[in-house]
Amino acid sequence: MLLSNQPANTKPQQTPSPSQTQNFKSKLQQQIVSAAAAAAANIANGSSHHHHHQNHHHHHPLNNHHNHNHNQHNISFATDFSIAAIMARGGNAPSSREPSERSLSPASVERYSGQDADDDVDVDVVDCSDSEMPSATAAAAAAATTAAAAAAALQAQQQARQALRVAQQQQQQQQQQRQQTHHHATTGKQQRQHHNHHSSNTNNSSNSGNSNTNSKSSSQRGRSAAAVGAAATPSPPPPPPSQSPEELERLSPEESPAQQPTPKIVGSCNCDDLTPVQCHLETKELWDKFHELGTEMIITKSGRRMFPTVRVSFSGPLRQIQPADRYAVLLDVVPLDSRRYRYAYHRSSWLVAGKADPPPPSRIYAHPDCPLSPEALRKQVVSFEKVKLTNNEMDKSGQVVLNSMHRYQPRIHLVRLSHGQSIPGSPKELQDMDHKTFVFPETVFTAVTAYQNQLITKLKIDSNPFAKGFRDSSRLSDFDRDPMDAFFFDQHMRTAPLRFFPDPLMSQLTPQEADAASMALLEKARQHLQMFGRSPYTEMLLPHLYQRSAAPPPPPPAPHLSAFQLGMWQQQWPQLTAGFLASANQQAALALAAAGANRTPPPSMAVAPPAPATPTSSCGSASPDLRARPQLNHYPQRFSPYQVPQHQASPPASNRAESP
């Protein structure tokens, strides 16, 4: 019979027999089993099975059997197996029986839609009755829904596991890239990165275990889908480890990545007339060498001079508004930053040790030649070689007071002095006058009480001609070594027992031997005096030190000086000609005789010289009189290679009587 939309109680109800009930139950069980199998097969096949049935339906449009199967598979594939949909179907089953019955009946139900909702459906009255059909159909729908939900949960679990494996592989690749990027970082940073890397791996493993545990239950399919979406998008790299302020202070300004750049001190000008004036650092090449290593300047209680020295020159239009206008060149040293430093010997670099100490009152050092005229300022090189650095805050001699282990920047000020103005002595007075400030970044230095960097010490010894105290002698901490060395040298030269060539002989040899070779040889002999001043050598050894004999003399009856074998000394020292010392001795004897007779000696000797006034040596060559020691008292001054010969006074009467 046909089942229409009319009420079912319009026809008389028939009581089913027991045999019909048993047949209906067996058929219902078969339908449930077949429905579950069909639902599982549809879910496994997916879209391929759907496309296959679409093509099959296109080739057989008039076949009702294929059309019926196609509608049935479409219903199964389009079914939503989410939790919300299953609960909605379960809640609406008692109120609206037709959608659930018609959508899940495997044998005799067509596809239900809004357009054919009023169509009649053929129902076998013999197999079922109105009283048993609703409950049996609901049970079949519940069983099919449960089977489909189980199959969907199994598939979602597999997809979630695959997504987790992909996410773990991506995380491992990102970790390898981060390790390669930070391979050249410092040891401290590598340790912190290793710690963060280990903690991130622990969190990832715990999250992976939780995700696997949650994906096993069918009630967490929504979280699994979210994990799949998160795996498709690569996670951003973790932020770099944050550094504490204490760690930043331990790093040097050049090595701290998060630290702000060192503030740079720039020049200034408050006068338009001084704007085109330029200042040039004369010793820029030497300053650049020290700046690459980190310049250090010694400060002491008594004050120490700067090396390299600040030497500048000026160029440009130095205008003179009034005839009385003059210029002054000033120097001051200002702190570069507000930090105190320490030197790390194991790293050979300067590190920040903390905040700076309170700065002493700023002082301005004026050049001693100031004030200068514009013409003199253009031609003159202004050298601040006399400025001294000290750490004595009670100093009253005008020295620049600095703090040890702090960085400083020297500045040059060009001040125009009008009529009635004096040289400023403080920064406050400088601001009230027309001036221009020049800054050279290569002159930055660190004030120290002892050199920290060994390369700086070596460079200063090699570059500073007054650094002999570092090579030789004692450790003088509170005294300036340059004046001490000058004092020792002066005392040594005053008491030197040996002079190669006396000054009367030099005055006689200089006009005759005016060629460059002879003068250079004499200067070399004078320089050797510094080496042999404290040695017991006398003038008798001069022939053996400076002369190589051409032929050995005949054997004398007694031992003589020619028997000495000086070896390498004879080959290293500059050699003189064979007759140079003999003629020098003759000229010395003539000079002494002329001084005794108060007359000028002849310029040259054409005849054989007279017998020497002094005893001759065993080798036959005349030697200077070793007993004439009082003659040396007339020349106690220190030797200079550019000494001008002075007029010799006549010797005393005692010397006249002794001379022949």
UniProtKB/Swiss-Prot annotation:
SUPFAM superfamilies: p53-like transcription factors
DNA-binding region positions on the chain: 286-472
GO molecular function: DNA-binding transcription factor activity, RNA polymerase II-specific; RNA polymerase II cis-regulatory region sequence-specific DNA binding
Listed Gene3D superfamilies: Transcription factor, T-box
Entry superkingdom: Eukaryota
Ranges of compositional bias, category Polar residues: 1-11, 23-33, 643-660
Coiled-coil parts of chain: none
Record's keyword terms, sorted: DNA-binding, Nucleus, Transcription, Transcription regulation
Localization: Nucleus
The keyword Transcription regulation is assigned to this record: yes
Biased composition (Low complexity): 12-22, 35-47, 93-108, 169-179, 199-233, 614-624
Main location: nucleus
PROSITE patterns, per the entry: TBOX_1 (PS01283), TBOX_3 (PS50252)
Start-end of Pro residues biased regions: 234-243, 600-613
One GO CC term, this protein: nucleus
Sequence ranges of Basic residues compositional bias: 48-71, 180-198
Region of interest (Disordered), ranges: 1-72, 90-122, 169-266, 598-660
InterPro entries registered for this protein in UniProt: p53-like_TF_DNA-bd_sf (IPR008967), T-box_DNA-bd (IPR046360), T-box_sf (IPR036960), TF_Brachyury (IPR002070), TF_T-box (IPR001699), TF_T-box_CS (IPR018186)
Record-given protein name: T-box protein H15
UniProt source species: Drosophila melanogaster (Fruit fly)
Lineage, opening ranks: Eukaryota, Metazoa, Ecdysozoa, Arthropoda, Hexapoda
Gene this chain is encoded by: H15
